[in-house]
Amino acid sequence: MRALIVVMDSVGIGGAPDAAGYGDEGADTVGHIAEACAAGQADSDQRQGPLQLPHLAALGLGEACEHATGRRPPGLQQKAGAGAAFGCASERSRGKDTPSGHWEIAGVPVPFEWGYFPKTVPAFPPDLIDQLCASAGLTGILGNRHASGTDIISDLGEAHLQTGQPICYTSADSVFQIAAHEEAFGLDRLYRLCEATRPLVDRFNIGRVIARPFVGRSASGFRRTANRRDYAVPPPEPTILDLATAERRHVVTIGKIADIFAHRGTGHNLKGDSNDTLFTRMLEGLDALDDGGLLFANFIDFDTLYGHRRDVAGYASALEAFDARLPELLDALRDDDLLVITADHGCDPSWSGSDHTRERVPVLIVNGRSAGSIGARTSFADTGATIAQHLQLPPTRHGNSFWPNGA
């Protein structure tokens, strides 16, 4: 009896009741990708035609979309299989960011408002930058504005190589991001700089400091590497990871999960440089997962490579590639395992700007027993509550099990 949470990062399905308050009314990541594919607007060298997600559809993705928005996207008309359990969930936390979504999935909605840096130039208070430069021995910084990570590296990467000054920027999320060249600036030096920055931004209630290393020699050749590292504040209450760890359960985390939870209760962490590699790491982790254990995985490419970059065709291709590997995961499950596939927020690649979008998320469940609709859940925390129930852990403080009387 084991439990798995698989987060398809940013794979929202629209319909959030409070989306208008975020400027996201009508945003629908999966729905708009499916519509673009059906209209021939997402054809590329990697994929063509309607969106093909037969295995996610068999788990109830079409029904989950219908729960969220009242309609099924084109290409997801296939009915869920007889053993599928499915629904959607709304976020209770105020943010539409990575920590808020993941913490709530793990049973802890964020009870406060994150701090954000203003969309001004400069974006950061002068005294913060003075402290940062003094603590790290810097002559100054570059950037100091809201920006897309790939764009600002292209814009300022050459100046960074010339001056040795790191590129500091933010976004609509509660983040302070630092980009630097892995070789010229040094990866370890970048990590130390981020570690020094973490306490400096605490007074602004900033969720994450993010190291964004890159390589290349000119604007046309700069590219970010897989050595990103997030320095997050820890969750304000015990999560399902903490509960499992306290009970001496085997915990395996995949991808950036350990960073998101500030390495608290995250057990053995396996990393990879792509969704495909992460999927392989997940299968390895599952193969080694003890009875009573918890595996928590994040698949980041949907968000970072395609959502933020507003690449509809790339996002569609990534969804189809993930779907094609799903049978490997399903075949590796034991009869008494519980699998929940969900998302942490949306990032509609057809939407304006480059930020996350406030959306409901799918909740697709495989547990070998209960099937059918779990409806539209009012909190992501219901997933954490259900995992705790399944693993016979102490109950989470927030959320309600999908099956109050047991699966």
From Swiss-Prot:
Necessary cofactors: Mn(2+)
Predominant place of localization: cytoplasm
CDD domains found in the cross-reference section: PPM
Catalytic function, reaction form: 2-deoxy-alpha-D-ribose 1-phosphate = 2-deoxy-D-ribose 5-phosphate; alpha-D-ribose 1-phosphate = D-ribose 5-phosphate
Isomerase among keywords: yes
An example Gene Ontology CC term for this record: cytosol
GO molecular function, one term: phosphopentomutase activity
Cofactor note: Binds 2 manganese ions.
GO biological process, one term: metabolic compound salvage
Positions bound to Mn(2+) 1: D9, D344, H345
Pathway(s) the chain acts in: Carbohydrate degradation; 2-deoxy-D-ribose 1-phosphate degradation; D-glyceraldehyde 3-phosphate and acetaldehyde from 2-deoxy-alpha-D-ribose 1-phosphate: step 1/2
Annotated localization: Cytoplasm
Superkingdom of origin: Bacteria
Binding site for Mn(2+) 2: D303, H308, H356
Keywords on record: Cytoplasm, Isomerase, Manganese, Metal-binding
Job of this protein: Isomerase that catalyzes the conversion of deoxy-ribose 1-phosphate (dRib-1-P) and ribose 1-phosphate (Rib-1-P) to deoxy-ribose 5-phosphate (dRib-5-P) and ribose 5-phosphate (Rib-5-P), respectively.
Record family assignment: Belongs to the phosphopentomutase family.
HAMAP family xref list: Phosphopentomut (MF_00740)
Protein name, UniProt field: Phosphopentomutase
Biological source species: Bradyrhizobium sp. (strain ORS 278)
Lineage, uppermost ranks: Bacteria, Pseudomonadati, Pseudomonadota, Alphaproteobacteria, Hyphomicrobiales
